[in-house]
């Protein structure tokens, strides 16, 4: 369901414009050889005019700090830079919804943390709705509105971060090893206090 409509009723062009998707492996998403062209590719595919493309590409290069490597070959970029480029190229189309499928799984811890902070910034500054699948729960739980926890391919629980913490504590579930430190401490202490979910 997308804004109250079955997704099958939403045209492909509207889906392409309004629903952004970032893959797990940055190599599988890049389609051009130059950074600037990757930023423009989606807009070109949707038929935007040249002035609009240039404006949006410049906005994204500035917003994401890409201007320093704007003219580089994509092959020269690190994994973190490639994933950031994928995100910027999607955001150039101004999607309402951004879906990210384990976008940090190929990144080192510092690049992953930086990438997730950028996603958080997009949600906070631009208001884009984010759906994120992620194993780094300690990094995303504190800023999530709603969490769905999967375990062995099945939905274990869902709710606000605080409710997730309380559930996992009640169930003595090992998933707490990947939760933020305040939640881990909460799980180890006998109390009836609300679960802390913010760092």
Predicted regions and their residues:
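Conserved catalytic motifs of ABC-family nucleotide-binding domains
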Residues: 94
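Catalytic Walker B motif of ABC-type/P-loop ATPase nucleotide-binding domains
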Residues: 98-101
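Conserved ABC ATPase "signature" region
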Residues: 51-69
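Conserved ABC ATPase signature
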Residues: 73-77
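Conserved beta-strand-loop-alpha-helix hinge in the C-terminal portion
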Residues: 154-183
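H-loop/switch region of ABC-family ATPase nucleotide-binding domains
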Residues: 134-135
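ABC ATPase NBD Q-loop/coupling interface
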Residues: 1-14
